[in-house]
């Protein structure tokens, strides 16, 4: 048993979608989350910059004595997963490979759409991961940077947001995909609108769910589970825009939580 907390990090509020799954499947675990609101979005930034920001976020979480780290951000996973795995003395997992594994399990026609930030799409991280798992899979990637802004502004259910989603995802109709990877942790916040845009016959895959299952496996194999019984309260930190972050977090997680501001540079 190991009662230390688990660290989660993201460029903004999107990582809360992974946290929500973790709180459901790992109710005994203490979670410490940090969102880099001051410097988001990560998607358009150079890889070297994302690596540096990821190091800084991980360093902050390490001061909280975490026992494992989840990079709850696709852009940061692509840029910094291998770096942080090499540099940190604890298990570090990302969201890309778990997402590809889940999509391969779901698809029936081997046609898989991928929506993500510009950085993740340009890196071809998901097509590469899918090809490693199953060479018969065909990936159809589309950059949807605008979706991040919709989520961060908490405009999830507006008519304007649905119009943007309909326009960006229209091409998937002719591609005849049957599975769509939500390749940015912000995107499950827009799940309802995305499903409406692509139609009911397309299965949406949230990589965060598979990521938490992998986390459970690691905690079990390495005897890192938290003991049953009372645990410390989960902690939430943001590098900027506390009010907006807190509002989204409280609504999405359905908790009366408090977010603390932290300066990282």
UniProtKB/Swiss-Prot annotation:
Keywords linked to the UniProt accession: Cell shape, Cell wall biogenesis/degradation, Isomerase, Peptidoglycan synthesis
GO MF term list: glutamate racemase activity
PROSITE patterns in the record: ASP_GLU_RACEMASE_1 (PS00923), ASP_GLU_RACEMASE_2 (PS00924)
BP terms from Gene Ontology: cell wall organization; peptidoglycan biosynthetic process; regulation of cell shape
Disulfide bonding pattern of the chain: none
Reaction catalyzed: L-glutamate = D-glutamate
Its job: Provides the (R)-glutamate required for cell wall biosynthesis.
Name this polypeptide is given: Glutamate racemase
Lineage: Bacteria, Bacillati, Bacillota, Bacilli, Lactobacillales
């Amino acid at each position: 048993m190991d009662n230390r907390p688990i660290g989660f990090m993201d460029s903004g509020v999107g990582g809360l979608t992974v946290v929500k799954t973790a709180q459901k499947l790992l109710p005994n675990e203490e979670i410490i989350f940090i969102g880099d609101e001051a410097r988001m979005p990560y998607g358009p930034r150079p890889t070297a910059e994302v690596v540096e920001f990821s190091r800084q976020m991980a360093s902050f979480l390490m001061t909280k004595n975490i026992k494992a780290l989840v990079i709850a951000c696709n852009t940061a996973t692509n840029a910094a997963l291998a770096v942080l795995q090499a540099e940190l003395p604890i298990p570090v997992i990302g969201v890309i490979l778990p997402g590809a594994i889940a999509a391969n399990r779901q698809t029936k026609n081997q046609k898989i759409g991928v929506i993500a930030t510009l950085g993740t799409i340009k890196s071809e991280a998901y097509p590469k991961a899918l090809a490693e798992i199953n060479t018969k899979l065909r990936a159809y990637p589309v950059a949807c940077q605008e979706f991040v802004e919709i989520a961060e502004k908490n405009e999830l259910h507006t008519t304007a947001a649905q119009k943007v989603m309909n326009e960006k995802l229209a091409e998937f109709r002719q591609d005849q995909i049957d599975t769509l990877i939500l390749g940015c942790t912000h995107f499950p916040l827009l799940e309802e609108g995305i499903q409406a845009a692509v139609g009911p016959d397309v299965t949406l895959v949230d990589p965060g769910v598979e990521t938490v299952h992998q986390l459970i496996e690691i905690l079990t194999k390495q005897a890192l589970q938290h003991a049953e019984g009372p645990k410390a309260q989960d902690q939430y930190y943001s590098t900027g825009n506390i009010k907006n972050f807190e509002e989204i977090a409280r609504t999405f997680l359905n908790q009366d939580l408090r977010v603390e501001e932290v300066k990282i540079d």
